[in-house]
From Swiss-Prot:
Location in or out of the cell: Cell membrane
Name assigned to this protein: ATP synthase subunit beta
HAMAP family: ATP_synth_beta_bact (MF_01347)
Organism this protein belongs to: Acholeplasma laidlawii (strain PG-8A)
Entry's Gene Ontology cellular component terms: plasma membrane; proton-transporting ATP synthase complex
Amino acid sequence: MKGKIVAIIGPVVDVSFMDELPNINDALEVRLSETETRTLEVASHLGNHMVRTISLEATDGLARGMEVIGTLSPIKVPVGKKVLGRMLNVLGKPMDGLDEVDTKRYMPIHKLPPDFHDLGGETEILETGIKVIDLIAPYIKGGKIGLFGGAGVGKTVLIQEMIHNVAKNHGGISVFTGVGERVREGHELYHEMKDSGVLDKTALVFGQMNEPPGARLRVALTGLTLAEYFRDGEKQNVLLFIDNIYRYIQAGSEISALLGRMPSAVGYQPTLATEMGKLQERITSTRYGSITSIQAVYVPADDYTDPAPATVFSHLDATTALSRKLTEDGIYPAIDPLGSTSRALTPSVVGQEHYDTAREVQRMLQRYHELLDIIAILGMDELSDDDKLVVHRARRIQNFLSQNMHVAERFTGQTGSFVPIRETIRGFKEILQGKHDDLPEEAFLLVGTIDDAIAKAKKL
């Protein structure tokens, strides 16, 4: 199947075919030289034997009249164990300066979600080692988790910490998909993983900020295809990290405008919910294995009612909200214990003791926030003895929700900590019972277990 380029407008390329037309989402190739090709993806049929395509690479070097070859299938990317430890682009080509991935297995990036009868149903908790997450908004194996936050509140650091903890403590395979984020962060992540020894359990796929919108839109599907093969072909439990899902929506919005579709609310594409559904419905557990996905969600201007974060919300099992106020107070990870939620925080899943401890922590923090206005106007002395005790313990709880990160060791000089869930529950239970009312507040800041806080208090 051969055609000719008839128009190029930025990343949009119109191609005419003399006989049959390629299918929607099929890949087309343009040869620039013996070694160089450009890949296009069919977006719509225009009539008169013409198709409109989106280029997945820069359109430099393309010209009208060039020959286009139909591949008769969607983009296919390499899958399997050979992609572990590698850094790939949207087309599955290496970005790490090494040779092509040596595998015979290739899979198309466009496919249907698993059949209903193939889905897995049991609910099991994924231990992250991060106290505030494990206590307040526990993650489900095979669930979808959103990290919500504005610019610079620590979404990427939290994702890197999660990759580190899962690789070190669960031995699982991770697929990291960088969608429209900074090239520098991808470079740092690659070298950090190499240094910490978790790279050989991870596949990295990047379509960064400098790439055309076609690459940024499709790179999430490339990462997902790699994860699906590990789940179904290798029968593994996989972690899929997407940083940032908002950039996926943003790329879809750019392409929608380039294709001349009428925008909907706030300039987003009219197909926003459909595009998100196609991606999210493929991220699930089957009877063969599970994909647990952790997605960073940039919230434009910290506005949670924006259509992009609002659309993502409807697909999630747990939400981890990052708070700018907590970063200003020096509490890291800056996760808001009152704004974060999880479907798993029920007695039937986590057990009665865990549930009661988490709810009591939230109740005390909620009361503390209500009292802050009174304290600001009248001072601590005007509070009742009960309320003074709430403030006293809530401050210790708020500090104890922080901890040092392994991936931030070289910045902070402090050793990172992985805290098992049972230790997390014990620590918060003891604070709630008043066993550590005599320790100073600072002793609870950026420590791991309650024993670390007691040891720190002795040094103060």
